[in-house]
Curated annotation (Swiss-Prot):
Top-level taxonomic group: Bacteria
HAMAP family reported for this sequence: Ribosomal_uL15 (MF_01341)
Family label: Belongs to the universal ribosomal protein uL15 family.
Biased composition (Basic residues): 8-20, 30-39
Designated gene of the protein: rplO
Entry-linked InterPro entries: Ribosomal_uL15 (IPR030878), Ribosomal_uL15/eL18 (IPR021131), Ribosomal_uL15/eL18_sf (IPR036227), Ribosomal_uL15_bac-type (IPR005749), Ribosomal_uL15_CS (IPR001196)
Name of this protein: Large ribosomal subunit protein uL15
Low complexity bias spans: 40-49
C-alpha cells in the first residue's frame, strides 16, 4: 500500500445534492421543496427557535433569578500557581506584571489548592481559610489589601 494508491472507503465522499438540474437527477422541477406552501417559496426561512406554531422551548421554560449588577468578581489563584513562581513576596503589582491579574479588574482571591514549601508574603484582596492556614503554616504572611 502506497500513498499514491490510497482510496477512500465506499460512500465516504458523497456527491453534493444538485437541485433543479433536470428530472433525471431526481431533484428537478420542484427542487425537493414539494408543491406550494410557505416553505416552497423563495426567501422562506423560519425564524430561529420556531417550532411550527407550537409554543417554543424558550417560552415554555420559566424565567429564573436575576443578574446582580453590583456583583464583585475576583480573579482566583491557587497556592499551586504561587509555588511555581518562586518568589518571596508577591504584591498586586507583581501579579499584574506577570500577567496573572488584570489591571482593570484588579481584585484577587487566593485559594488553597496545592502546597507551599517556602515561606512567601502574599498581598491579596481575599484569602480562603485553607489558603491562609497553609501560607502561615510554612512561615509566610497573608496580607489583606483594602
Amino acid at each position: 500500500m502506497n500513498l499514491s494508491n490510497l482510496r477512500a472507503p465506499k460512500k465516504a465522499n458523497r456527491n453534493r445534492k444538485r437541485v433543479g438540474r433536470g428530472m433525471g437527477s431526481g431533484h428537478g422541477k420542484t427542487s425537493t421543496r414539494g408543491h406550494k406552501g410557505q416553505r416552497s417559496r423563495s426567501g422562506s426561512r423560519s425564524m430561529r427557535g420556531f417550532e411550527g406554531g407550537q409554543m417554543p422551548l424558550h417560552r415554555r421554560l420559566p424565567k429564573r433569578g436575576f443578574t446582580n449588577i453590583f456583583r464583585t468578581e475576583y480573579t482566583v489563584l491557587n497556592l499551586s500557581r504561587l509555588a511555581e513562581l518562586n518568589e518571596t513576596e508577591l504584591t498586586i503589582d507583581a501579579f499584574i506584571a506577570k500577567g496573572l491579574l488584570d489591571k482593570r479588574n484588579g481584585l484577587l482571591k487566593i485559594l488553597g489548592n496545592g502546597e507551599l514549601t517556602t515561606a512567601i508574603t502574599v498581598h491579596a484582596h481575599k484569602f480562603s481559610k485553607s489558603a491562609q492556614e497553609k501560607i502561615e503554616k510554612v512561615g509566610g504572611k497573608a496580607i489583606l489589601v483594602a
